[in-house]
């Protein structure tokens, strides 16, 4: 999960750090439209970190019975994944600031792309929970 935002000047290769995301995210998607970068959803790592901690605990456990209980707890964490963040953000390049936008209704996909057509964006498929892909296509309008 990262909250760093970098800008690269393509001709010179110069990189500059911009204002951080209000919260660290990974695997979200976004588009650029009229001097703003729109970031849709993302994984804040809450469940990921808990699952990774459980895996480490399982690996370090020697007692078979306790290990089975830990595996069951880890599996439950994964099966009951709440989904990813449905928060949306816009970064205004002119003011160097973030604006919180209305969230998506329902689950927000990650590990996908967004396509812009005019002021409409399309987010096809993606994961809505860890390992759970969706066939939904989200369509939105930037106003």
Regions found by a protein language model. Name each.
Residues 1-143:
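Kelch-like beta-propeller repeat domains
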């Amino acid at each position: 999960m990262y909250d760093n935002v970098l800008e690269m000047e393509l001709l010179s290769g110069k990189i500059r750090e911009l204002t951080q995301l209000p919260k660290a995210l990974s695997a979200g998607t976004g588009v650029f439209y009229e001097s703003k970068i729109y970031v849709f959803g993302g994984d804040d790592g809450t469940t990921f970190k808990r699952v990774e901690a459980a895996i480490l605990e399982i690996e370090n456990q020697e007692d078979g019975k306790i290990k089975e209980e830990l595996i069951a707890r880890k599996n439950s964490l994964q099966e009951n994944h709440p989904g990813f963040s449905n928060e949306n953000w816009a970064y205004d390049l002119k003011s160097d600031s973030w604006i919180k936008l209305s969230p998506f209704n329902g689950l927000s996909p990650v590990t996908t792309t967004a396509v812009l057509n005019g002021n409409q964006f399309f987010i096809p498929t993606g994961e809505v929970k860890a390992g759970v892909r969706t066939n939904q296509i989200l369509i939105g309008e930037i106003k």
